[in-house]
Design a protein with these regions (language model features):
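Charge-rich, low-complexity N-terminal segments
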Residues: 2-8, 12-164
Length: 164
């Protein structure tokens, strides 16, 4: 049985390693994928099920990341081995709890933004775009750097105060 911490943290087995490190798994093909979708049937139980499933699968597959959510938006970053991230994204596209799935960023990286998190949950309290901004099309105008910057800011916030 696989046990995943309820807070979404993971261990360091999947963090990028340097070649030649004794006993470590080297992951040289780290893909970072960010997508946005609209929740279908958003409530606490649905969100809990999504997070539990994501943390279980991500721990198994060496994926880390974060899910920013509220009733009108899911914004998620996945990072890990290319094949595994691609498979996870394909599952998300097929998942009927997500509507209007749109890929915003898909790039190779050497370092993870969330190396310690199988799936960080952030309830989008204040730092994500407002509902009015979303309705006005902020995502259509946002650059990949803008979207990545949101997650880098979240990572800095979590690393500064992990209890927040």
């Amino acid at each position: 049985m696989l046990v995943v911490p309820t807070d979404g943290r993971t261990d360091h087995r999947f963090a990028p390693c340097t070649a030649g490190t004794t006993g470590a798994t080297v992951i040289s093909d780290i893909t970072q994928l960010i997508y946005v979708s609209q929740p279908f049937g958003y409530d606490g139980a649905t969100l809990g099920a999504i997070l539990l499933d994501a943390r279980r699968c991500n721990t198994r597959d060496g994926i880390t990341g974060a899910l920013v959510c509220r009733h009108d938006v899911y914004l998620q970053l996945l990072e890990g081995p290319t094949e595994k991230v691609t498979a996870a994204y394909a599952r998300i596209i097929r998942d009927d709890r997500h509507a209007g799935v749109k890929e915003l960023v898909n790039r190779k990286v050497t370092d993870r933004i969330f190396p310690d998190w199988a799936m960080l949950h952030d309830p989008a309290k204040s730092w994500i775009w407002s509902e009015e901004e979303m309705s006005a099309g902020v995502l259509e105008r946002a650059t990949p750097a803008d979207v990545i910057g949101l997650f880098e800011g979240l990572s800095a916030k979590v690393n500064a105060d992990p209890s927040d």
